[in-house]
Amino acid sequence: MKRSLALLTVLVMAAACGEEKQQPLAPAAITLNGDVFDVAQAGETIALEVTAPSRPYVTDCPDWIRTEAVGAFADYQMTINLTSQANYAFENRTGTVTLQAGALSRTVTVRQAGREKPEPSVGESAAEAVRKMGAGWNLGNSLDANSGDRTHMWIEASYATPVPANYETAWGQPVTTRALFRMFKEAGFNAIRIPVTWYPHMGTIKLQWENEDWHWDMSTWTEYDVDPVWMARVKEVVDYVLDEGMYCILNVHHDTGDRGEEKKGTAWLVADQFDAAKDRYAALWQQIAETFKDYGERLLFESYNEMLDSYDSWCFATFASPDRYDATVAAAAYAGINNYADLFAKTVRATGGNNATRNLIINTYGACSGDGAWNSHLTDPLTQLALPEEPGHLAVEVHSYWEADKFDAQKADIDRLFSNLDRYIVRRLGVPVIIGEWGGGNVSDEVAARFAGYFSQKAHDAGIAALMWMGLSDGKDRAVPKWTMPLTKDAILKPYLP
């Protein structure tokens, strides 16, 4: 009996030993379930099966591919998901993902098709739209009004729950009415630009009481959704313009611009900081585009207003730097402008509807026009601009401000401005030009009219749509409505009279 029990014990132990899992041998190289993957244009997730002697890590990856480890590294094996974003470009793209495991490395190629190019549009071209716009005007200091200073958020602090009218009237203008635009249309204007500042109406602005004032820590600004009440008001004002039969330009305004010497400003779109803002920027334009996707061709979208570099340089990139020019930062700023323009166009086009062929406006760096001859870099904002898509439904915008009381001394400079726009934009890029803002300073109606008549005639002769910044009807006059500068109004319209 004892002998039988001993034999049984030996057999059980032998069986148990036989059931032990054999530890696999460490591989000598990294092996994958594929070296090249083709993914869908709409985006796709690939399960990359990796076998390696040690835990593999992704060390390099294009920004349109997101990587995520699935589960643990066990038995020298691991799964890594490669998720590609949708490719809204018309061109195919290829990216390389690099894996590292100890001293070993391996690359994976991901290929993604672009969108199919649409059939040639039968809609109005940008050149036709600009030609029809003629003379225009800016509804300034209304929907673009904002606190503007992160250390003094006075509008938000003044109201428990601000409503659109609190912003619209904050800078001294009345609530906008349809009658105002009817007055402009009946006079002969055919285009209105509606500047809109969006940051106060995206997500939540959380205020903190510091140094006896209300501050905004922008790092707490995480949400992207636009307040539907604000969007409804913007839509209402756009409808006013379109209902009067005029062209309407809708933009992203004081989300760009000068942030001041101590960088207290609220501008969050900076030319050489594209990566920091691209997700919010795309989300903003996606919401605007979806809201207006069924609107007709008389509505144009403008990418951004006056976007500056991290030095807040006007005239050309890095002019405000200590040495008055920094080639590295300037290159990043111009590349950033082109990246923002590209993202803007692709985001709008991807929403479909009439946005597939809507005329879009791309602004130069700072909306700089290249006027002047005192520095060789003045034309850089024009020469460094690249188009995000083929010409046809694109226009380029610049801004131009002068001193009307020095008009006689500036005629040659004004002439050179229009010559540069023709040379560096119209002929080089093959797109029309819009002067989205122009003016002659704070002068009398009589002085402004003389300058404005000349400037408007130059724009008319060049086939450029020019929209004056405010002035023509401001403050209490807008509520009537009536003209604040009737002589200037007449001078602007004279070249367009039959």
Regions found by a protein language model. Give the residues of each.
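Extracellular glycoside hydrolase catalytic/binding regions
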Residues: V163-A165, A282-L300, Y304-A465, R478-P495
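Short, surface-exposed loop/turn segments at beta-strand-coil junctions that are enriched for proline
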Residues: Q85-F90
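A short beta-strand micro-motif common to beta-rich folds, especially ectodomain repeats
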Residues: E91-A103
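Solvent-exposed, low-complexity, repeat-rich "mucin-like" stalks and linkers
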Residues: A28-T59
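Bacterial Sec-dependent N-terminal signal peptides
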Residues: L5-A6, L11-V36, T107-S121
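Surface-exposed binding patches on compact interaction domains or structured appendages
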Residues: A52-T79
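Active-site mouth of glycoside hydrolases
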Residues: E124, V130-G370, D474-G475, I492
